[in-house]
Curated annotation (Swiss-Prot):
Pathway: Purine metabolism; GMP biosynthesis; GMP from XMP (L-Gln route): step 1/1. Residues 8-206 form the Glutamine amidotransferase type-1 domain. PANTHER family: GMP SYNTHASE [GLUTAMINE-HYDROLYZING], GMP SYNTHASE-RELATED. SUPFAM superfamilies: Adenine nucleotide alpha hydrolases-like (SSF52402), Class I glutamine amidotransferase-like (SSF52317), GMP synthetase C-terminal dimerisation domain (SSF54810). Homodimer. The active site is at C85 (nucleophile), H180, E182. One of its GO terms (molecular function) is ATP binding. The keyword Ligase applies. This is GMP synthase [glutamine-hydrolyzing]. It comes from the Bacteria. Its EC number is 6.3.5.2. The gene is guaA. Keywords: ATP-binding, Glutamine amidotransferase, GMP biosynthesis, Ligase, Nucleotide-binding, Purine biosynthesis. It catalyses: XMP + L-glutamine + ATP + H2O = GMP + L-glutamate + AMP + diphosphate + 2 H(+).
Length: 525
């Protein structure tokens, strides 16, 4: 088959929080795209041979000369270009237009009125005005605005506060949009992006799960040959899909190590070993390291320190098992595209603050001296799930809610003890079971229980109890960057609370977390 990446769409990143969302929308069309920093090298650009370019938004202002600009040679490349928000503004300035800061800023919904005909927006509308003009509901987020068009451009849409909300030079296939078509709040946003990517750029639409799997298998076989591959299997979506993909590609050459940290969900170890070992026939080395992890965590209450200890201990256990396998040449990892983007530091916001270290246990040991294999490093999480389904993994496994790498260690808001982990495991399992029973599980994005290190008075029968408190957390989100707490039915929450208090020894009270993100994070630690 043809190389799926031979003529990608490129997204040049100016630091927008929505840059990855643009890429996900493009991938949804079946088009392969990649994200690069706005200052991409010209030689690298030519080697990529893109079919078109999108300039992302960003937090800077083009009214300051020192702020980011697109490479000037880009505007002489004869490729279709689409600038979004900051991308439109830098396009305007660099091609001879003008941008000024505005006292009338636009943040949130705006009604967009289309001007005449443009290839980008023609026949796309939410409704029509009395005079017959097409109207769109769009999402704005800007303080600056284009006040004078570059030579050769025309206005293609406007809002009340932005007379130039979109511009086009049809002869050179250059377009600018002040609003954000990539967010779901812009109802016709996907159609607009599709018009640019598929119709104007003529991008091939072959980026499908079937083709992705075929190409990945061919690449794995070509890289690995007859050598053996080691994979740390956690039971999470990423490592599970890597295991299934590698097993299909190289069969018995794959060896997995599964580490039971003692901080997993109820029956999780048994489920992973059953699915991948007994049912799929993958060779799995199972290590029960509960005592080692609990000993290492003894007396530690700081969340960041707990993360570091869990990560370090995991590496030690994995390294110990790997050293026993003398014929392994490759180490496979479930690195996905957002990890690659973040590690490549494509964002222009160098002053970003680390809220908490990344949950996923990473940094497997360099001492293994193995070649690295990352078969899903070009996929977003939603694409990983689609590939997993195509490989035959169960829907419930592929669409299981996210679980942090440190496991229950960051859901016990105290020193991690076996007693606390056992209580939390049972309470969490009841919550998840009832969400499934009520057909609510797949309507929310993430749900879990948290163990609180406080005791509360309760009454059971004629006796007085002084036991621990469990807090339930459920959120709804599109991208996990922001989240709303889920408004679960009161009778449902009452049923879950009743079951936990009656069935989990050591719990006298259940609460529900009604904090959004921001200001709270989704996980408590």
């Amino acid at each position: 088959m043809n190389d799926l990446k031979k003529s990608p769409l490129l997204i040049l990143d100016f630091g927008s929080q929505y840059t990855q969302l643009i890429a996900r929308r493009v991938r949804e069309m079946g088009v392969y795209c990649e994200i690069y920093p706005y200052h991409i090298n010209h030689e690298q650009f030519k080697k990529l041979n893109p079919c078109g370019v999108i300039l992302s938004g960003g937090p800077s202002t083009v009214t300051h000369d020192a702020n980011p600009r697109a490479p000037q040679w880009l505007f002489e490349s004869d490729l279709p270009l689409l600038g979004i928000c900051y991308g439109m503004q830098t396009m305007a300035v660099q091609l001879g237009g003008q941008v000024h800061s505005s006292a009338l800023r636009e943040f949130g919904y705006a009604e967009l009125r289309l001007h005449g005909h443009s290839q980008l927006l023609s026949n796309i509308e939410d409704r029509t005005a009395v005079d017959g003009s097409a109207l769109l509901d769009v999402w704005m987020s800007h303080g600056d605005k284009v006040t004078e068009l570059p030579p050769g451009f025309k206005v293609i849409c406007e809002t009340r506060n932005a007379p130039i909300a979109g511009m086009a030079d049809e002869s050179r296939q250059m377009y600018g949009l002040q609003f954000h078509p990539e967010v779901t709040h812009t109802l016709q946003g996907l159609r607009i992006l599709q018009r640019f990517v598929v119709d104007i750029c003529k991008a091939p639409t072959e980026w499908t799960p079937e083709h992705i799997i075929d190409e990945a298998i061919n690449k794995i076989r070509e890289q690995v040959g007859t050598e053996k591959v080691l994979l740390g299997l956690s039971g999470g979506v990423d490592s599970s899909v890597v295991a299934a993909l590698l097993h299909r590609a190289i069969g018995e050459q794959l060896v997995c190590v599964f580490v039971d940290t003692g901080l997993l969900r109820l029956n999780e170890a048994e489920q992973v070993l059953s699915m991948f070992g007994r049912h799929m026939g993958i060779r799995i080395i199972a290590v029960n390291a509960e005592d080692k992890f609990l000993t290492a965590l003894k007396g530690v209450t700081c969340p960041e320190e707990k993360r570091k200890i869990i990560g370090r201990t995991f590496i030690e256990v994995f390294d110990e098992e790997a050293q026993k396998l003398t014929d392994i040449k490759w180490l496979a990892q479930g690195t996905i595209y957002p990890d690659v983007i973040e590690s490549a530091a494509t964002s222009t916001n160098d002053a970003a603050v680390v809220i908490k270290s990344h949950h996923n246990v990473g940094g497997l040991p360099d001492t293994l001296n193995l070649k690295l294999l990352e078969p899903i490093r070009e996929l977003f999480k939603d694409e990983v799930r689609q590939v997993g389904l195509e490989l035959g993994l169960p829907h419930d496994m592929v669409y299981r809610h996210p679980f942090p790498g440190p496991g229950l260690g960051v859901r016990i808001l105290a020193e991690v003890k076996k007693e606390y982990a056992d209580i939390l495991r049972k309470a969490d399992a009841i919550f998840i079971e009832e969400l499934h029973n009520a057909q609510l599980y797949h309507k929310i994005s993430q749900a879990f229980a948290v163990f609180l290190p406080v005791k509360s008075v309760g009454v059971m029968g004629d006796g007085r109890r002084y036991d621990y408190v469990i807090c339930l957390r459920a959120v709804e989100t599109v991208d996990f960057m922001t989240a709303h707490w889920s408004q679960l039915p009161w009778d449902f929450l009452g049923k879950v609370s009743n079951r936990i208090i009656n069935e989990v020894e050591g719990v006298s009270r259940v609460t529900y977390d009604i904090s959004g993100k921001p200001p709270a994070t989704i996980e408590w630690e």
